[in-house]
Amino acid sequence: TRLRTVTGVQTCALPILHEIDSDRLTREIQLNVGALTRLSHAAIRAMVPRGRGYLLNVSSVASFQASPRLAVYSATKAYVTSLTEALHEEMRGTGVRVTALCPGLVRTEFQSISSTEQYSRDFPSFSWLDVTDVARAGLRDMARGKVLSVPGALYKGLFAVSDLLPRALVRRISSLATGRH
């Protein structure tokens, strides 16, 4: 099912939580939360004694709001962003820089792996970021000591506005974008 929003942008209809295999959900949580936490821990333990290092954790703009039909994904990415912000503060003064890279839609193999390839065409071309540009932005922002890196003018704007809007309104907008209406 597809939905047209007021702006005329077609949006996709992703599965809701109870329609997703529980093993798939567990793997997503293990990867986005468990593995990232263990790798961050190991990296920081090696960097702190040296008094220098860089840690760039890949999160998502989905981490900034609840995303119906992407509930587990946005929740795990919220964890990544929150953990990274906390580590950024913990590492202050140690020479270790910690940044969360929070891109929006990026054209990669993720679409085929996540079975969302068919939804790619549902989003306007201007909403897609180039993977090389995203990587460069993340590395640049990390080198500058920024805690959050949000590549792309569209997503920077959405990020700025999302903090100003009531959470209920942001959830509703997210619902429209993911096909839950």
Predicted features by range, described:
Residues 1-12:
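Single conserved hydrophobic/aromatic residue that forms the stacking wall/gate
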Residues 67-71:
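Active-site loop immediately N-terminal to the catalytic Tyr-X3-Lys motif
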Residues 90-153:
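SDR active-site lid
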Residues 60:
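Residue(s) in the substrate-gating loop at a strand-loop-helix junction
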